[in-house]
């Protein structure tokens, strides 16, 4: 919306270089664009038109004449607002939102995320509390997350998408928050509320592909435009979607500007970039003969590499204090290395290897875990090759994979004990944490995108509510202690911030390690993944610590454990302390 020559109206622009003609149509002209032909801006491929009297709330699309003379009607790729699906029109909108998160924004870039606590609660917005709007969520979600001590939320889905079952991973409106939950200003209200509660906001961002809907980006002006012309490179084999043409400068600009837009316009603190591996490899999920190599005969996609580098460098330059996080499932070198050192430039990377191995370990019966001991220790071989997030995400608790507590062996008590011990190990392990909703209170059912978390498990009327509240209390205490202990986050990317104490006790199912803060202050984490109590278990400790005090014990009665705790300080003798290790539990100790 703008004023031109003293007249209020809306200026429409669209990139359609292959079009023979473009017209604006909408409810203001009964969807007949004959009266609103757009003019070409020459070799740029952009068409534009100022329409007087068109303002907030007007529905519109572009009527495009293809090179062959046929017509197609398309939504605006850069629309700031869209209709509620299944309707597909774009909506003229102008924000009037007045932000109240100035204190958060001013402090956002004060300390590098790698040297700060970073604990993420992953939220599927439509199902966290089904039926709530952005503004209604703002009345509940910030308080809940802040109470549990998470530093950030990661929200999905955010950008507009036609198929709800895609969970937002098949985007058509890259610049529009999904209208299912409200307007763009309503979404800003939610972000604002989270910031005012002291919670950072990450969003899932999907520049890897887009759906084939005939009103959206696919063959937008009658020719491949946002997608490569080579059909083998264009078609994404896993999802039936189309990949972006990262070698085309206009497409790169569309995506880079989009990343900046979310962080500047909506105060988003970070982007978790989905499916990075599928962008980096030309042969991703393709058989021999189904892909074409790059100009050097290789399988990597240099255009995608250049795009990711440009996106990260531009975002960090334009919006200091934001973080980008790669969901990258291969061993690509330099995902979190700086772009000036020829890395991709991400701030963090999901540690899919740690997730796969550690979940594999805890799913075994304790008697068999000794044969899989390396699955819990191998992560430290490469822990400092990238800057990692340890993700227990939505992908791990759906499609037959079971909820986290249900992955664990044994009876209900043992499953909960395993769950608690695992989270204690995870929060102490080098790397940042991410936990999907519902796992913080050990719901036993898989995540349902329709029904969301099973909140009734926490109700007074439910006979086992205490079991689930105990797990939630543990997550709260894990986050509280984590944020208070610099040893657990200050040197996450520094190998000298970690040392094994016991890494080879496969027969015992025991792991013990030290974490060190920048000033050298240690924290000792000990995990016993056996149902057997270990009496007088010897652990070597630094000589300069006169006594150790239990800071957290996942076996405490308040969490639902057997309450085998040690309230008194433990003094070392000859460089060792002797502990009684509770069954299926993790214990943290700090200098007394």
Curated annotation (Swiss-Prot):
Keyword entries, A-Z: Carbohydrate metabolism, Glycogen biosynthesis, Glycogen metabolism, Glycosyltransferase, Transferase
Function per UniProt: Catalyzes the formation of the alpha-1,6-glucosidic linkages in glycogen by scission of a 1,4-alpha-linked oligosaccharide from growing alpha-1,4-glucan chains and the subsequent attachment of the oligosaccharide to the alpha-1,6 position.
EC class (word): transferase
Catalytic activity reported: Transfers a segment of a (1->4)-alpha-D-glucan chain to a primary hydroxy group in a similar glucan chain
Cross-referenced Pfam families: Alpha-amylase, Alpha-amylase_C, CBM_48
EC number: 2.4.1.18
Residue numbers annotated as active site: 274 (nucleophile), 327 (proton donor)
UniProt record, GO biological process: glycogen biosynthetic process
Entry's family note: Belongs to the glycosyl hydrolase 13 family. GlgB subfamily.
Keyword Hydrolase: no
Gene Ontology MF term list: 1,4-alpha-glucan branching enzyme activity; cation binding; hydrolase activity, hydrolyzing O-glycosyl compounds
Keyword flag Cytoplasm: no
Pathway annotation from the record: Glycan biosynthesis; glycogen biosynthesis
GO CC annotation: cytosol
Listed SUPFAM superfamilies: (Trans)glycosidases, Glycosyl hydrolase domain
Record's subunit section: Monomer.
Protein name: 1,4-alpha-glucan branching enzyme GlgB 2
